[in-house]
UniProtKB/Swiss-Prot annotation:
GO BP: killing of cells of another organism
Molecular function via GO: flavin adenine dinucleotide binding; toxin activity
Lineage top rank: taxon: Bacteria
Source organism phylogeny: Bacteria, Pseudomonadati, Pseudomonadota, Alphaproteobacteria, Rickettsiales
Source organism of this protein record: Rickettsia typhi (strain ATCC VR-144 / Wilmington)
SMART domains tied to this protein: CorC_HlyC
GO CC terms, sorted: plasma membrane
Keyword set, alphabetical order: CBS domain, Cytolysis, Hemolysis, Repeat, Toxin, Virulence
Domain CBS: 81-142, 146-203
Protein known as: Hemolysin C
InterPro entries in alphabetical order: CBS_dom (IPR000644), CBS_dom_sf (IPR046342), FAD-bd_PCMH-like_sf (IPR036318), FAD-bd_PCMH_sub2 (IPR016169), Ion_transp-like_CBS (IPR044751), Transptr-assoc_dom (IPR005170)
Note: Confers a hemolytic phenotype when expressed in the nonhemolytic mutant of Proteus mirabilis.
Length: 305
């Protein structure tokens, strides 16, 4: 009996591995197809069909990837872009030595935008490894020489088209511009990949991102300031936003109650039941807030863990 059990476990593991290999292989085919010069709709949907046929044997994660792929065709740049208010960028005239110190302290990303004059005139981006290489070799270099090119995308551009364009242009960053040519936001290659495989955490990521929150207890929630107010309303079962209000996010809600970005530790009464405390912010934007509910959460509306 013991030998039979081991054999069954081995067979089960082998089948699971085969499923995973199939999914990964099809994903690679799909991505390769997106970048192919001879791609046809039949090839694209043929791969999707093969994935769907095997969906009954997929794990939850694999099914999520398939669902993301099916939804990707209808998503646009505007759906996933980092808004202008959250963009971290550096002036073209910045000294390299000063820039290295600034990046160590303030910039949590490996790629940083460079602008000339204003953020509406982005000239490219630098990779942190290029900067430190120039400093280590004591090259008489300027910031301008380290700049890598970016591409331009409209908010309405399809994500599949942007992914293909990034590959053709061999760049990892796209600047999103509005109808007047102003900078509206940015999208990175990591943003696109995350739309397919889910969130990718690295050493610079915080615990929370723009799509989630953390319930601390029955009366406390920690949330990213970019979470939409409608989601919070759904969770706490309380109306916060009026039809004529011009904000969409929790951060926007807070800013309508104060004249400027509040300092960390500031507490703001939103209603008789809701108090919001700022727990992370920069001089220009809110990052993270703590939401206190005096009446507590409705346990029937949210699964507390």
């Amino acid at each position: 009996m013991l030998k039979s059990s081991k054999k069954e476990d081995s067979s089960s593991k082998k089948n699971q591995d085969n499923k995973l290999i199939f999914i990964v292989r099809q994903l690679f085919y799909l991505i390769k197809h997106l970048f192919s010069k001879t791609k046809t709709p039949d090839n694209f949907f043929g791969i999707i069909k093969r994935l769907k046929i095997n969906s009954k044997k997929m794990s939850l994660d694999e099914c999520n990837i398939l669902a993301n792929l099916l939804q990707l065709e209808n998503k646009t740049v505007e759906d996933i872009m980092v808004p202008r208010s959250d963009i971290v960028a550096i002036k073209l005239t910045t000294n390299l030595a000063e820039l290295s110190e600034s990046i160590k302290i303030e910039v949590p990303h490996t790629r940083t935008l460079i602008y000339d004059g204003t953020l509406d005139n982005v000239v490219g981006f630098i990779h942190i490894k290029d900067l430190f290489k120039a400093l280590a070799t004591k090259q008489n270099s300027t910031l301008k020489r380290l700049i890598r090119k970016h591409i331009i995308a409209a908010p309405s551009m399809k994500l599949l088209d942007l992914l293909a364009k990034m590959r053709r242009e061999r760049t990892h960053i796209a600047i999103v511009v509005d109808e007047y040519g102003g900078t509206d936001g940015l999208v990175t290659i990591e943003d696109l990949i995350e739309e397919i495989v889910g969130r990718i955490d690295d050493e610079h990521d915080q615990q929370l991102d723009s799509t989630n929150f953390k319930v601390i207890n029955n009366s406390t929630i920690i949330a990213n300031a970019r979470i939409e107010v409608e989601l919070l309303e759904e969770i706490i079962k309380e109306k916060i936003k009026n039809d004529d209000d011009e904000f969409d996010t929790i951060g926007g809600l807070v800013l309508t109650r104060v004249s400027s970005v509040p300092a960390i530790g500031t507490r703001i009464d939103i209603s008789e039941n809701i108090e919001i405390e700022v727990i992370d912010a920069t001089p220009r934007s809110l990052k993270q807030v703590k939401i206190r509910l005096k009446n507590g959460l409705n346990r029937d509306s949210f699964n507390l863990t």
